[in-house]
Structures are given as C-alpha cells and as structure tokens.
C-alpha cells in the first residue's frame, strides 16, 4: 500500500437544507378550522361527576397496588389516564368497575 491509500478518508459531508421557505409556505396554506377538526364520530360529553372521579381514583389506586407501583401523584395520573383510555377504546375487561366509569354510578 502506498501512503496515499493509507490516509484516512474524511466522512462524506452532510447536505444542508437548501431553503426551508417552501415547507413554511406549505404549512401556511394548511388551514385547520374547528369545523375540520370535528369528525362525525365526535360526541359531546358531559363533565365527569365527583362520584366518577372518586371511582376513577379508587381504580387507579387498586391498579397501582396490584402492580406494586409506588403511589405518587405522577403514577396516579398515569394510571387514571390508562384506565380512561382503555374504557374509551373499548378494551374488554372482566371487571365491572371499569364499566362504571363509562356509564356513571
């Protein structure tokens, strides 16, 4: 091998983005109105009752106890969000307690 072959080659340079203006221009053209955001499947929901919130808190506490996770405000919030998302997604659960949140007390 001659010395020129032994030299380490520099990595290829990354290409710089030319002009971001076209992307910005496209985003400016996108108009999202409230009417566009509402889907036919969107339903108006009533605010939860105190009884529903209490039941949700109880279910979240029970879930954290079953999974042996320390009960902190953060873990309670995540457990509550998990329960709400499971109920709204219609995930089947053998527990009748989860259905109580969906249907009310």
From Swiss-Prot:
Bias (Basic residues): 10-20
Chain location of the short sequence motif Nuclear localization signal per the record: 13-20
Superkingdom per UniProt: Eukaryota
GO cellular component terms given for this protein: cytoplasm; nucleolus; protein-containing complex
Gene Ontology process terms (BP): mRNA export from nucleus; positive regulation of gene expression; protein homooligomerization
Keywords: Cytoplasm, ERV, mRNA transport, Nucleus, RNA-binding, Transport, Transposable element
GO molecular function: protein homodimerization activity; RNA binding; RNA stem-loop binding
Expression tissues: Expressed at higher level in placenta, expressed at lower level in several organs and cell lines.
Chain span(s) of sequence motif Nuclear export signal: 50-59
Consequence when changing residue 20 to A: Total loss of function and dominant negative effect
UniProt cross-references to Pfam families, sorted A to Z: HERV-K_REC
Location of this chain's protein in the cell: Cytoplasm; Nucleus, Nucleolus
Region (Disordered): 1-49
Disulfide bonds: none
SUBUNIT field: Forms homodimers, homotrimers, and homotetramers via a C-terminal domain. Associates with XPO1 and with ZNF145.
Reported function: Retroviral replication requires the nuclear export and translation of unspliced, singly-spliced and multiply-spliced derivatives of the initial genomic transcript. Rec interacts with a highly structured RNA element (RcRE) present in the viral 3'LTR and recruits the cellular nuclear export machinery. This permits export to the cytoplasm of unspliced genomic or incompletely spliced subgenomic viral transcripts.
Further facts: Despite functional similarity, Rec shares almost no sequence homology with HIV-1 Rev and HTLV-1 Rex. Two proviruses inserted as tandem repeats in most of individuals tested. Both proviral genomes encode identical Rec proteins.
Listed name of the protein: Endogenous retrovirus group K member 6 Rec protein
Lineage: Eukaryota, Metazoa, Chordata, Craniata, Vertebrata
